[in-house]
Amino acid sequence: IIEGGQTMNPSTEDILHAIEKTPAEIVFVLPNNKNIIMAAQAAAELASREVVVIPTKTVPQGISAMLSFDAAMEPSENEAAMTDCLSGVMTMQITYAARDSDFDGFDIHAGDYLGLCDGALAGTTREITTLLASLADKAAEAGKEFINIFYGADIQESDAEAALELFRQHAPDAEVNLVSGGQPIYYYLISAE
């Protein structure tokens, strides 16, 4: 695991160092950020061992890819399985606006909650439950069957439990789970598959 974040992208050297200190003969790298994929691919070319880069763009994609890994399969089979699962992952995030702006037809004010769905702005509001309901509806409309809600460091467990119930109401056909992710910046990271 390499520490990073939205503004702390690891370099090719950081990734290569992590690869080289791993005792595995074959290393799978999950960037979990579109801005890190090229650095991971460059590190893979420089590594002294076999490296497979799975082009994960979000943490939910990375989790899904990890769950698709099977130690009994050949590396090429794992690469195919891990990569194939990515297209079925809907990634939703709730964060906040740092400043006033207009974007994609949304009038955004500093402090507003921002809802993102697969990287696109899906809504903005002062009321987080409105945004959660909207994202739950998107998952239900897309026919997603498994939803994992990772709540961040700034969310109280009772609020996260309320979000879980809201998702269960809006997406009644899905299995919905709640996990304390403890992540900064994002109040919620939501994976729907």
Model feature map: region roles:
Residues I1-E193:
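N-terminal loops that bind phosphate or other acidic moieties
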